[in-house]
Amino acid sequence: MPRWGYSVKLRDESEVAKAVLRNVPVHPKIMAEVARAISGMRVDEARRYLRAVIEKREAVPFRRAHGKQAHRRGLADKWGWPVGRYPVKAARYMLKLLDNVEANAANKNLDVERLKIIHVAAHKGITLKRWMPRAWGRATPRNRVHSHIEIMVREV
């Protein structure tokens, strides 16, 4: 059995709420870009931003996984980087994670209105190996990569 933990160790966790989602069916590269975009935001601000991403009103800047990606209007002004996408599926899972961490914060008697994201990360999860049959008896691998997402918030 694997041993799960967080990638950040804190001395005092009394003012911090944590949450994690395991085996999310989104590639870790995409989840890492969404995590980088919301890192340091307040929870309500991150929620508004992710809803705008789902509605395709705001794009997420893709700084690492951006090969042959289009430039998006307004990204360079806000983020200083013109290349971006609208990762709707990743934003939905990140919203679910924000709901979880907000509930955990309420359970620890933290003020939900004043929560700020201090850490968010995406790590590689399991890979489901599949094979797609091709012509002449060949087969091509079709791997489905999953992600683990973790988040920590603190009351400010």
Swiss-Prot record:
CDD domains: Ribosomal_L22
Cellular-component GO terms for this entry: cytosolic large ribosomal subunit
Source domain of life: Archaea
SUPFAM superfamilies: Ribosomal protein L22
Gene Ontology MF terms: rRNA binding; structural constituent of ribosome
Keywords: Ribonucleoprotein, Ribosomal protein, RNA-binding, rRNA-binding
Any Pfam family matching the protein: Ribosomal_L22
InterPro entries: Ribosomal_uL22, Ribosomal_uL22_CS, Ribosomal_uL22_euk/arc, Ribosomal_uL22_sf
GO biological process, one term: cytoplasmic translation
HAMAP family named among the record's database cross-references: Ribosomal_uL22_A
Subunit structure, as described in the record: Part of the 50S ribosomal subunit.
Similarity field: Belongs to the universal ribosomal protein uL22 family.
Protein purpose: This protein binds specifically to 23S rRNA. It makes multiple contacts with different domains of the 23S rRNA in the assembled 50S subunit and ribosome.
Protein name (database record): Large ribosomal subunit protein uL22
Source organism of this protein record: Aeropyrum pernix (strain ATCC 700893 / DSM 11879 / JCM 9820 / NBRC 100138 / K1)
Source species taxonomy: Archaea, Thermoproteota, Thermoprotei, Desulfurococcales, Desulfurococcaceae
